[in-house]
């Protein structure tokens, strides 16, 4: 502590003592007003004695208070008590002074019990040595305090210490600002990084969806075809560009990446008829098949005619076609066209060898063109009509028989006779071996003027051929039916074929197996055919392999 601070402490203590003395004077005036009520005995201490007691008490307090060393250059009294005695005039003390005297003086100067005196205010003094001077709260200061009593600083030195402590705390808190700024920078970085990750994730998700969408068909409901030519030597990137320009894919680059990812490396050149309803996967599979050397008309549908179908069955199959065709392809229109004499005449002129022996109008044939439409799969295009479709089937039969025309003629057979025999062979046998044996039986019976006795012809006459016929129904057929197709009663062949025979049945009928067999019966449950060269053996085969299974 500096010397200046010590001097200020002494002066402050002095001022406090003077205030206490002024307080004593105030108490003296109060006691004078109360003398009318309370009278003290004759031996009551005088004001001078009370003042002496007060000074003794102050001296006692000062002796117990810690001393503050003074600077040698300053003329400061050795003790605060001496300074007060020199500067303070004698003031009579009031009996109600609440400052206690020393124990010695209190025991020696006070008389015995006397009349009741005003109760003295008790005060507590800090007897613990301290390095700061003790201050008292004056009456004026107490009067100014309206609210609850709050502790008052002991000295100005304490205030200085507290102010210094506050300043040091404030000054010590200043270096924390860079930490806050650093934390704010870190927080901003973390937020920015999280936003970046969110944007990156969103971009990846939408990018993935964009690629998937690019692999889907351009128009899933489109039925139109687009003709595209892929030049020889084109790489997958060039093919993707070509397809993008044709409006078949959204992005050629994505198409090429997908082709490489799926390892589609064998894409072929040529002309293709592709649809916008095809996905990227469908386009790649189509490009693997290879295109045509020249542009072809797009195929809207395919028509498959099974082997052994009758014209009625073929008409029904045509009527099931669906597509945006040039004209309506119905079963009724098909049957009407195959019976159109003008169309038949044009066909005979177009395919003279094939239709040279075609049944005449009054032959009793149900359909003159029955058996002349080759069973196969046909492409139905936008320009396909009923007439063009029938013509295509006739052309297919003419093409397949062209290799056998000379052989047929050498066997003294007409095309109509060959196709009629082949139509029966088609239904009677399933295996090529059996078909050749059955064809041989028919030739043997024809050569002997024996009726063919084929149930197939009777079923056709009844309009049941092609239907699911049980073994019992087959055995119970009406062999007395009045029809040119009743080969049980009529000797020789029917007016014409009863179905469209397969190429295998045709070849089996041309190259039949020669034998002396005149009879055969098939066990439909086992698919086995039993042959005989006489009626007795044949009847035994029928009883054993057919009739025994009817029960």
UniProtKB/Swiss-Prot annotation:
Pfam families: YceG. It catalyses: a peptidoglycan chain = a peptidoglycan chain with N-acetyl-1,6-anhydromuramyl-[peptide] at the reducing end + a peptidoglycan chain with N-acetylglucosamine at the non-reducing end. The chain crosses the membrane at residues 188-208. Residues 159-174 have a biased composition (Basic and acidic residues). Coiled coil: none annotated. Residues 100-110, 145-157 have a biased composition (Low complexity). GO terms for biological process: cell wall organization; peptidoglycan biosynthetic process. GO terms for molecular function: lytic endotransglycosylase activity. The keyword RNA-binding does not apply. GO terms for cellular component: plasma membrane. It is an enzyme of class 4 (lyase). It is found in: Cell membrane. Residues 38-180 are annotated as: Disordered. Disruption phenotype: Essential, it cannot be deleted. Its EC number is 4.2.2.29. Residues 1-187 are cytoplasmic. Residues 209-551 are extracellular. Gene3D superfamilies: Endolytic murein transglycosylase (3.30.1490.480). PANTHER family: ENDOLYTIC MUREIN TRANSGLYCOSYLASE. Belongs to the transglycosylase MltG family. Interacts with RodZ. Interacts with MreC in the elongasome; interaction is strongly reduced when the 90 C-terminal residues of MreC are missing. Interacts with KhpB (also called EloR/Jag) via MltG's N-terminus, suggesting the N-terminus of MltG is cytoplasmic. NCBIfam families: endolytic transglycosylase MltG. This is Endolytic murein transglycosylase. The lineage of its organism: Bacteria, Bacillati, Bacillota, Bacilli, Lactobacillales. The gene is mltG.
């Amino acid at each position: 502590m500096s010397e200046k601070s010590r001097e200020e402490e002494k002066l402050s203590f002095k001022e406090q003592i003077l205030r206490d003395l002024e307080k004593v004077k105030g108490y003296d005036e109060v006691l004078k007003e109360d003398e009318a009520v309370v009278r003290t005995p004759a031996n009551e201490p005088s004001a001078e004695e009370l003042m002496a007691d007060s000074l003794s008490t102050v001296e006692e307090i000062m002796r117990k208070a810690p001393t503050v060393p003074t600077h040698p250059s300053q003329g400061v009294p050795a003790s605060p008590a001496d300074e007060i005695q020199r500067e303070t005039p004698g003031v009579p003390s009031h009996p109600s002074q609440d400052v206690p005297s020393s124990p010695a003086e209190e025991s020696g100067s006070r008389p015995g019990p006397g009349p009741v005196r005003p109760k003295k205010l008790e005060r507590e003094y800090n007897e613990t040595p301290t390095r700061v001077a003790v201050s008292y709260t004056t009456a004026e200061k107490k009067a100014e305090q309206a609210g609850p009593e709050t502790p008052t600083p002991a000295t100005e030195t304490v205030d200085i210490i507290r102010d210094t402590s506050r300043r040091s705390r404030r000054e010590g808190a200043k270096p924390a600002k860079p930490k806050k700024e650093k934390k704010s920078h870190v927080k901003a970085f973390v937020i920015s990084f999280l936003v970046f990750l969110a944007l990156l994730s969103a971009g990846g998700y939408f990018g993935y969806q964009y690629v998937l969408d690019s692999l889907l068909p351009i128009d899933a409901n489109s039925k139109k075809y687009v003709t595209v030519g892929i030049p020889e030597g084109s790489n997958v990137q060039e093919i993707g560009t070509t397809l993008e320009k044709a409006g078949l894919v959204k992005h050629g680059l994505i198409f090429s990446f997908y082709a490489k990812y799926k390892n589609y490396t064998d894409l072929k050149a040529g002309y293709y008829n592709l649809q916008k309803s095809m996905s990227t996967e469908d386009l790649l599979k189509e490009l693997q098949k290879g295109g045509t050397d020249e542009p072809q008309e797009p195929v809207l549908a395919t028509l498959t005619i099974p082997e052994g179908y009758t014209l009625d069955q073929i008409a029904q199959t045509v009527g099931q076609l669906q597509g945006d065709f040039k004209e309506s392809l119905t079963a009724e229109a098909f049957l009407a066209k195959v019976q159109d004499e003008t169309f038949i005449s044009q066909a005979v002129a177009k395919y003279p060898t094939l239709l040279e022996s075609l049944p005449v109008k009054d032959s009793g044939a149900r359909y003159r063109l029955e058996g002349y439409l080759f069973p196969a799969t046909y492409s139905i295009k936008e320009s396909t009509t009923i007439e063009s479709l029938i013509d295509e089937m006739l052309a297919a039969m003419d093409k397949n028989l062209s290799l056998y025309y000379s052989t047929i003629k050498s066997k003294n057979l007409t095309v109509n006779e060959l196709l009629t025999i082949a139509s029966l062979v088609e239904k009677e046998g399933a295996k090529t071996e059996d078909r050749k044996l059955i064809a041989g039986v028919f030739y043997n019976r024809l050569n002997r003027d024996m009726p063919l006795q084929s149930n197939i012809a009777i079923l056709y006459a009844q309009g049941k051929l092609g239907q699911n016929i049980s073994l019992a129904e087959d055995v119970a057929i009406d062999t007395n039916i009045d029809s040119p197709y009743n080969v049980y009663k009529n000797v020789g062949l029917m007016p014409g074929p009863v179905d469209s025979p397969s190429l295998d049945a045709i070849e089996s009928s041309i190259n039949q197996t020669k034998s002396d067999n005149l009879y055969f019966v098939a066990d439909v449950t086992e698919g086995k055919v039993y042959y005989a060269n006489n009626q007795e053996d044949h009847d035994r085969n029928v009883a054993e392999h057919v009739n025994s299974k009817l029960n």
